[in-house]
Curated annotation (Swiss-Prot):
Keyword Transmembrane helix belongs to the record: no
Residue ranges of the propeptide: 16-27
Keywords for the protein's UniProt record, in alphabetical order: Disulfide bond, Glycoprotein, Hydrolase, Protease, Serine protease, Signal, Zymogen
Active-site residues, Swiss-Prot/TrEMBL: 68, 113, 209
Signal sequence segment: 1-15
Taxonomic source organism: Bombyx mori (Silk moth)
Name used for this protein in its record: Vitellin-degrading protease
Length: 264
């Protein structure tokens, strides 16, 4: 496989090699089984009936995910499963009524890898379904602080998906060190953050894309991309929510207003 770069387009169900970017559909490696009550904000983003990406419930009618998970397809191609420890059963299914991805996102750079989904029927909150707060605009995670990543992605590089929700605990990596690790081929921008362990073995991987990275009980990152999975020399790369919080807030408001106005 060219340069060992695995490109997993979960929304298309295709895998191909590329010399340019090792993009997402990331998975949990080195994690542990958990139940949904431990991460009730975690959702499965389903594309035409099958799990394709993770997502995070930030309001009863809003899911945040990665742009590369939903770009170029219609809202009706997606449904959201909430309240289940399993991506293929249980919980409740909700239609996606509309979506927006960042206009400056592109697959070449993976910069601005963020999207929001609007649900015409808000979810019902309970023990297994709950929204999570997002980090504040321009807030920073101190280097070395613990973050939590959850999802149903592959449990090893090139492996299969688990049926039960997984969790992995990884420290936040200094941006300069992360940029040096990926240089000169890949750029770490101000809208990305990195997390992983120096010895490797713990990471997100294929199938986790779009899912949450949580710091101090707030959504701080979105699983985006990486070179391989859980490799010691290459931390996982996440969309930095604090750098894009203003865009998220603005577009949540725009989507809601758009559909309120359509009623009149």
């Amino acid at each position: 496989m060219t340069n060992s770069l695995l490109i997993c387009f979960t929304i298309l169900g295709l895998a191909a090699s590329s010399p340019t970017k090792p993009i997402g559909d990331i998975r949990i490696v080195g994690g542990e089984d958990i139940v949904i009550t431990e991460a009730p904000y975690q959702v499965s983003v389903m594309f035409r009936g099958a799990h394709s990406c993770g997502g995070t419930l930030v309001a009863a009618d809003i899911v945040v995910t990665a742009a590369h998970c939903v770009m170029s397809f219609a809202p009706e191609d997606y449904r959201i499963r909430v309240g289940s420890s399993f991506h293929q059963r249980d919980g409740m299914l909700y239609d996606v009524g509309d979506l927006a991805w960042h206009p400056d996102f592109n697959f070449a750079s993976m910069d601005n890898d963020i999207a929001i989904l609007w649900l015409p029927k808000p979810v019902m909150f309970g023990d297994t379904v709950e929204a999570i707060e997002m980090v504040e605009t321009n807030s920073e995670i101190p280097d070395g602080d613990i973050t939590i990543v959850t999802g149903w992605g592959h449990m090893e590089e090139g492996g299969g998906n688990p049926s039960v929700l997984q969790r992995v605990i990884v420290p936040k990596i200094n941006e300069a060190a992360c940029a040096e690790a990926y240089s000169p081929i890949y750029a770490i921008t101000p809208r990305m953050l990195c997390a992983g362990t120096p010895e490797g073995g713990k990471d997100a991987c294929q199938g986790d894309s779009g899912g949450p990275l949580v710091h101090k009980k707030k959504l701080a990152g979105i699983v985006s991309w990486g070179l391989g999975c859980a490799r010691p020399e290459y931390p996982g790369v996440y969309t930095k929510v604090s750098a894009l919080r203003e865009w998220v807030d603005e577009n949540i408001t725009n989507l809601r207003l758009k559909h309120i106005l359509r009623r009149f």
